[in-house]
C-alpha cells in the first residue's frame, strides 16, 4: 500500500527533527565564547541548561494536544479519544526518570561523539526487555532474547571503536569512556521510565501528546529549581565551567549573549524535540510502531553522515560493524524479521506449488477412460 502525502510528510518530519535534536545539542557543545565577568573563552558545557530547554520543548506538546482537542470539538470526528479521570501526579515518577536520564545523556554528549551517543542509546531495548519480564510479567519471544544478545554485542563493538579511535584534545580517551558509560547508565533509567509509564500511566488511555507534555512540565519546573543549588555545588574541573560548579546557568546566558549562534542551537533543540514527539506519535498512529523504529534507525545514519561531513568526528570502519550489529539486534527485538520471513516463505512456496501443478497436469494427460 502506497503512503499518502501526509504520511510521507510525517515520516520526513520525524527523520529531520529527530536528527536536528541531537545535532543541535552537539553544535551548542562545540561553541566557544566568553562567560560572565570577562572570563576567558571556554566551551559551552551546560548540559543541565540544555536539559531544561528540552523539557520546555516537551512541555509545548501540551499546546499541540489542546489544539487537537479544540479542533476535534469543532469537527464531528475528534482525533482525541475521551479519557477517564486520572491523577496528574502519576506522571511524576516517570518524569523524574526522564529528567535524570536526559541530564546524564547531555553530560555524556559533552564527552563523546554524536554518532556514538546515538548508537549507544540502542541499549535501551536491553533494559526495557529485562524490566518488562521482571516487573510487567511479560514473556519475551526467543527472537527478542536473541535481539538483546546481538544488541549487547553491537554495543561492545561500538565501545571498542571508541577505544581504538584516535582522540583529539576535545575528547580525551578517559572522557570518551566515561561518556559511553554514562549513556549506558542513562538507558537503564530511561528503561525504568518506560516500564513505569506502561504500568501506571497508559492504562488510563491518556493521549501520548498529553503524557509527553505533562512529563515535560514536571521536568522543566523541577530541573529549573535544581539549577539554583547546582550553582553552588563544586565539582572541580568535571563541569568544564570557569567556577567549577555543577551547573552555572548565569555563565550559560552570558555565553549565549556573546555568541548568538548558541541561542540558535538551543532553539533548534527546543523546537525539534516538540515536533519530533508529535511526528513520532503520529507515525505510530498513521503507519506503525515498526515504521517509527525504522525511521529512528535512519536518524542515526543521518546524524552520523552529518557529523562526518561537518568534520566533527573521523570515520572508523569498526563503527559501521557495530552499527550493523545494533541494527540487526534492534530489528530482531522489534519483530522486523517476521515480514521478511513471511516474504521468503511465500517466494519459496510459489515455485513449489507451480511445480506440483505441472506434475499433476503431466500425470493427467491420459484420459481416465483410456487408462484401462
From Swiss-Prot:
GO cellular component: cytosol; lysosomal membrane; lysosome; mitochondrion; nucleoplasm
BP GO annotations: negative regulation of mitochondrial outer membrane permeabilization involved in apoptotic signaling pathway; positive regulation of cell population proliferation
Membrane topology type: Multi-pass membrane protein
InterPro entries: SLC35_F1/F2/F6, UCP036436
Localization per record: Mitochondrion; Lysosome membrane
Domain of life: Eukaryota
Transmembrane segments: 48-68, 89-109, 116-136, 145-165, 176-196, 211-231, 261-281, 293-312, 320-336
GO molecular function: transmembrane transporter activity
Span of the signal peptide: 1-18
Similarity comment: Belongs to the SLC35F solute transporter family.
Known role: Involved in the maintenance of mitochondrial membrane potential in pancreatic ductal adenocarcinoma (PDAC) cells. Promotes pancreatic ductal adenocarcinoma (PDAC) cell growth. May play a role as a nucleotide-sugar transporter.
Protein name: Solute carrier family 35 member F6
